[in-house]
């Protein structure tokens, strides 16, 4: 009986506990025990976890899988990543997304883009892949040129396929003004950069001559006669000299405030050198010996080994009275005594015009000869003592053009090679195409006048009507700003403050300009 009571008590407790559990169940949850299949299926789909559903990968590093188990997805992703790394190697770890595009996992984010940097290379070769390949042309050469052996080979042997004949390329520039370095090449292993080297060597100051002493002549037509002599001489050079088709007088004017000074600008430096070498001949033709011929003060002597007669070691012989017209044997004796070959000696002749040609000869020997030496030694100077000579390309300022590179510019601009003056030249301040607007020019001048202390005169070089942004118009100096200060101290202070500052969103570069040259030449040509 006692056992039966215990069983009854236990059964009653179980029934009470079952009743309490049924009261605590939420009514919607009772649908789980409903026999309606629709309700059971709907709730069953709602209760499934995300890991059991087929889905796209949460990140691009997880591959797509149809397995519903999360463990299988991780296993498949790990296996595929391991396979790609094994296939690509240590340097070719590129990956693909679901669309088949490849990307680099290490460099897929940047500061500008929040997404990966896609590479639509049709061959699907990434930069890291190419670096990992031991290609024949990627190896470092014997001379340490890195990966450029292939391109040096192409430049030397296949240059004509891409740039045409070399002579045709050089016809675009003047061969006489082409500068060479000590290795007799414009750039090591390349002739493609010859136009760039020519543009760095060309200069207006190197093509100008200043003729003074006109006021001492009693002939009122001396200026017109001088211009006719120069034009006839240049026309004769065009017929006798090779590559002289572009020889001409670019500008001929009287200096501002200097009525006894004439400035003659030629198209090239070699043309100005030949004219300067014949100064004694022109003085004799004009019937006066008071004219003085010289280079501008801003003339820069090129220390490089220049082609033909543009180097600083050129010597001009003048007033050779012992060598007459047609006496070639005397000229050969002179050359042999100086150890000069025919290629480095140039006798200069003047083409006679029809009005002044009384002898019937087409040309007249000027009694002037240009001699080109590699180095002017003391032995050569001793042999030149019996003759009257001078150096037409000699100047106070000199430079080595082959040293001008982007890497050497920071050091070159800090060198003090020019004499301090009251005139500063500001470079890289303006876009030449913006200077066709007169209102903009006025605003620039007013801004400079009130922002730079001690400025007296401001001149801006404006472009011509047909100006274009190309190398042909580089020598015109469009966009350059000339500022003349009231005192030398103000110019020095501006030279210390202006270089490196920002003007018109550009970095300002400054240099001194000779004051006499500015007043005589630039002031009349600028606005």
UniProtKB/Swiss-Prot annotation:
The keyword Magnesium does not apply. Keywords: mRNA processing, mRNA splicing, Phosphoprotein, RNA-binding. Residues 42-55, 94-109, 125-141, 155-169 have a biased composition (Basic and acidic residues). Residues 60-85, 110-122 have a biased composition (Polar residues). One of its GO terms (biological process) is mRNA branch site recognition. Residues 36-169 are annotated as: Disordered. GO terms for molecular function: mRNA binding; poly-pyrimidine tract binding; pre-mRNA 3'-splice site binding; pre-mRNA branch point binding. SUPFAM superfamilies: RNA-binding domain, RBD. One of its GO terms (cellular component) is U2AF complex. The modification Phosphoserine is found at residue 49. Residues 424-511 form the RRM domain. Present with 4170 molecules/cell in log phase SD medium. Splicing factor that contacts pre-mRNA directly and is a component of the pre-mRNA-U1 snRNP complex (commitment complex 2) that forms during early spliceosome assembly in yeast extracts. MSL5, MUD2 and PRP40 interact to form the commitment complex 2 (CC2), a precursor of mature spliceosomes. This is Splicing factor MUD2. It comes from Saccharomyces cerevisiae (strain ATCC 204508 / S288c). The lineage of its organism: Eukaryota, Fungi, Dikarya, Ascomycota, Saccharomycotina.
């Amino acid at each position: 009986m006692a056992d039966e009571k215990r069983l009854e008590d236990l059964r009653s407790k179980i029934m009470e506990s079952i009743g309490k559990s049924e009261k605590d169940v939420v009514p919607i949850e009772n649908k789980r025990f409903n026999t309606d299949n629709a309700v059971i299926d709907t709730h069953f789909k709602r209760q499934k976890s995300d890991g059991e559903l087929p889905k796209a990968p949460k990140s691009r590093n997880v591959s797509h899988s149809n397995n519903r188990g999360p463990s299988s997805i991780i296993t498949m992703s790990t296996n595929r990543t391991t396979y790609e790394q094994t296939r690509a190697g240590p340097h070719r770890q590129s990956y693909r997304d679901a669309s088949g595009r490849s990307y680099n996992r290490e460099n897929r984010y940047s500061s500008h883009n929040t997404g990966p940097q896609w590479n639509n290379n049709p061959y699907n070769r990434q930069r890291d892949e190419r670096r990992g390949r031991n290609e024949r042309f990627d190896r470092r050469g014997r001379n340490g040129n890195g990966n450029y052996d292939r391109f040096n080979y192409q430049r030397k042997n296949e240059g004509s396929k891409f740039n045409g004949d070399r002579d045709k390329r050089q016809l675009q520039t003047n061969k006489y003004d082409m500068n060479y370095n000590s290795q007799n090449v414009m750039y090591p292993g390349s002739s493609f950069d010859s136009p760039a080297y020519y543009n760095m060597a060309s200069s207006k100051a190197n093509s100008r001559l200043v003729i003074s002493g006109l006021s001492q002549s009693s002939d009122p037509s001396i200026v017109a006669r001088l211009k006719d002599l120069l034009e006839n001489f240049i026309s004769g050079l065009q017929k006798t000299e090779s590559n002289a088709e572009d020889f001409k007088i670019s500008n001929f004017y009287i200096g501002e405030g200097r009525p006894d000074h004439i400035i003659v600008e030629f198209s090239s430096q070699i043309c100005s050198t030949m004219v300067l070498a014949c100064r004694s001949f022109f003085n004799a033709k004009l019937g006066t010996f008071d004219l003085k011929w010289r280079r501008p003060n801003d003339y820069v002597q090129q220390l490089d080994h220049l082609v033909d007669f543009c180097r600083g070691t050129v010597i001009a012989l003048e007033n050779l009275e012992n060598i007459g017209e047609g006496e070639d044997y005397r000229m050969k004796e002179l050359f042999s005594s100086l150890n000069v070959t025919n290629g480095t000696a140039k006798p200069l002749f003047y083409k006679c015009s029809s009005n002044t040609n009384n002898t019937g000869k087409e040309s007249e020997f000027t009694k002037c000869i240009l001699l080109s030496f590699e180095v002017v030694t003391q032995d050569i100077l001793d042999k030149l003592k019996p003759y009257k000579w001078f150096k037409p390309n000699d100047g106070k300022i000199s430079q080595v053009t082959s040293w001008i590179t982007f890497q050497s510019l920071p050091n070159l601009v800090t060198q003090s090679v020019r004499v301090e003056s009251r005139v500063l030249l500001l470079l890289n301040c303006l876009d030449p195409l913006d200077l066709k607007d007169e209102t903009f020019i006025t605003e620039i001048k007013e801004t400079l006048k009130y922002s730079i202390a001690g400025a007296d005169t401001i001149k801006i070089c404006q472009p011509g009507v047909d100006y274009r942004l190309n190398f042909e118009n580089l020598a015109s100096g469009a966009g350059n700003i000339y500022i003349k200060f009231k005192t030398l101290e103000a110019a020095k202070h501006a030279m210390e403050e202006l270089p490196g500052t920002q003007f018109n969103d550009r970095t300002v570069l400054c240099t001194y300009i000779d004051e006499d040259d500015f007043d005589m030449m630039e002031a009349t040509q600028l606005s």
